[in-house]
Amino acid sequence: MKKLAFLACILTLFTLLPSLNVKGEYLYSQGSEIKDLYNEKIEAVAVFNGSNDSIYVTDEDIYLMSQVVYAESCGEPANGKLAVASVILNRARAGGFPKSISGVINQKNAFSCVKGGKVVHKGKPDVIPDSASYVAVLDALKGKDPTDKAVFFYNPVISTSQWMKDIKKANIKTIGNHVFFLVK
């Protein structure tokens, strides 16, 4: 029954997107105004970092982000999923990380769910994200960020990374089972 409901959500999502007459790309502008996400003249999502450098986000990036959000937070509340999506965008905007979504996600040891360039969940590659994961990614692109610009997160109960446990943290937020933070 859950599989049927999931398939119905995915089919609905993929049925609605083309009807919006979108050319596969969206726009997000950080700041006081959010641009129309469905303006058909837009060629990519422009996510701006502090130095006004743009990070362009394609449909493939949105799918990849949704896969990671699902694999890292499938048992978390909506705000936890949004927080994971926000960390990906925050890293792309911050110094010291790759400047693209795929670069951030595929950076070595960045996300425990990424193995050999594939997003893995419970040992199975090619994760298919659920609609809640897509919603979280799109909300993050609209500027929602419950982490207040965190670039790291971990689950203290299951984490095997001593670095995550020992590092001096700033801006700590606990959302669901994860701890989100910046490094001091």
Locate predicted features:
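Bacterial extracytoplasmic/cell-wall-associated proteins, especially those involved in peptidoglycan
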Residues: 43-184
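N-terminal secretory targeting signals
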Residues: 1-59, 176, 180-184
